[in-house]
Amino acid sequence: MKSCLKMLLVAGAFAVSLAAFQDDALADTQLASWYGPGLEGNLTASGDVFEPYTEYTAASPYLPFGTDLLVTYGGYSVVVEVTDRGPYTGGRDLDLSAAAAEEIGLTYTGVDYVDVEVLN
């Protein structure tokens, strides 16, 4: 009985810590940049045609393709879909399409921290 109670306590503690980790993964501040010039019409890692000036998309090194993100910067927000891998410059977490970056004003600074929330 005592060992059963200990197992329940350990399992409960694990479940609580896992839930906290998942919540942290849903909203985060990440270093973002943008990309697009010279890449229009190329295939993304997911197989989609890259349309940087008309579509709100993003590249992430680890989020699954099809993940929708709410990206906020300077009081402006945009919803993007992860369709590509990258960025490939050290320290950056997210690459936004030119259209998405322009929507929130990131094209002026080029690289900056943004708030990111996973929507699905």
Question: How should these model regions be labeled?
Answer:
Residues 2-8, 14, 18-120:
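Secreted/periplasmic proteins
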